[in-house]
Regions:
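Nucleotide/phosphate-binding catalytic cleft detector across ATP-hydrolyzing
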Residues: 1-11, 19-143
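Primarily the dimerization/phosphotransfer
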Residues: 14
Length: 147
């Protein structure tokens, strides 16, 4: 079965973002929704070395809502990635286990290099727009939240 609707979830240092895409056109991807929820995971990780139980509860609650939204859109595939706050917390494995058990969503942790690669790849995927901006002197800067 081919993927028709795809969700991408970014568990960032300061915010969770889920984008839903329609992939039904030939070689096209159309964003059909973007949901954001501010949860400051980074403040726990960077100040205390681990994410608090309260923030884990907030995170799981939001991801459950994301799962319901994915169901309403009939999402057939998803990817969920954690970045700096997840990568650098002392309780990464416990956190990932809690998320998967409580929400059914598996969050993979990206290394800093993997995160940057995906960011640049998404910019380059803009096709003609990307080709046009790199014809002149161009700098692409990554100003991330936590990394």
């Amino acid at each position: 079965m081919s993927v028709k609707t795809f969700a991408a979830i970014d568990v960032g240092s300061f915010e969770l973002t889920m984008k839903i895409f329609d992939l039904s056109g030939k070689n096209t991807m159309r964003e059909i929704d973007c949901i954001r929820q501010r949860i400051d995971l980074g403040s726990d990780t960077y100040a205390h070395g681990k994410i608090s139980n309260e923030k884990i509860d907030d995170l799981c609650h939001t991801l459950k809502e994301f799962a319901q939204i994915m169901e309403s859109y009939k999402v057939t595939a998803y990817k969920a990635y954690g970045t700096s706050a997840i990568r650098e917390t002392q309780n990464t494995l416990i956190l990932q286990d809690q998320i998967e058990q409580r929400t059914g969503i598996r969050v993979e942790t990206l290394s800093n290099s993997e995160q940057r690669f995906l960011d640049y790849k998404s910019i380059a995927s803009k096709g003609e727009t990307f080709r046009r901006i790199i014809e002149e002197k161009t700098a692409i800067l990554d100003i991330g939240g936590g990394s």
